[in-house]
């Protein structure tokens, strides 16, 4: 989820190429880097502050305002727009929003919230976890084959 970074008038042939994806399939994605969102979705969230220069999560949460521009630039959730490609999100356990998770960094709570945000922006998002409803593709390979072959 990012605007195209290509430079169509560049002399550099590589720089002229689009950076946009046509689809994405990910496993256990941390779809937000915002510590406030992370704590709301999964109270025992504790990972991510190091990417912004914080040694622990409490300092990250307390210093959130100082890195809001970076969160807006790099957090997948904040980058979703109506022109984004379809995504396939795979998680190993069902979601439980607002509850502590065994693996808070890779919880399907991230997938639930990203899917909601994608739906608000008319972006196709398939969320897969054990016993998930509305799964259209048996696995990431099936999703990718369909999207990449135009079937």
Question: Language-model features: where?
Answer:
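Primarily recognizes the serine-hydrolase "nucleophile elbow" in alpha/beta-hydrolase
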Residues: 1-41
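Mobile cap/lid helix-loop segments that gate and shape the active-site cleft of serine hydrolases
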Residues: 2-7, 35-79, 85, 106
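Conserved short-loop catalytic and cofactor-binding motifs
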Residues: 12, 64, 68, 99-102
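Surface-exposed acidic, glycine-flexible loop patches that form ligand/cofactor-binding
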Residues: 13-18, 77-81, 150-151
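Short, proline-enriched alpha-helix->beta-strand connector loops that line the catalytic pocket
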Residues: 17-22, 81-87, 121-123
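Residues at the C-termini of beta-strands that transition into short coil/loop
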Residues: 28, 53-55, 131
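Generic secondary-structure microfeatures
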Residues: 28-31, 84, 91
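C-terminal catalytic histidine-bearing segment of alpha/beta-hydrolase fold enzymes
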Residues: 87-102, 108-151
């Amino acid at each position: 989820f990012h605007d195209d970074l290509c430079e169509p008038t560049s002399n550099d042939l590589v720089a002229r190429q689009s950076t946009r994806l046509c689809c994405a399939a990910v496993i256990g994605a941390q779809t937000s880097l915002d510590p406030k969102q992370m704590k709301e979705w999964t109270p025992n969230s504790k990972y991510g502050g190091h990417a912004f220069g914080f040694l622990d999560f409490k300092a990250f949460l307390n210093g959130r305002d100082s890195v809001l521009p970076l969160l807006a630039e790099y957090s997948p959730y904040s980058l979703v727009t109506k022109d984004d490609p379809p995504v396939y999100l795979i998680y190993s356990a069902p979601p439980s929003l607002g509850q502590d998770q065994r693996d808070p960094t890779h919880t399907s709570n991230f997938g639930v919230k990203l899917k909601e945000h994608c739906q608000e922006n008319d972006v196709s998002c398939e969320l897969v976890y054990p016993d998930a409803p509305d799964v259209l593709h048996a696995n990431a390979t099936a999703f990718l084959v369909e999207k990449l072959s135009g079937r």
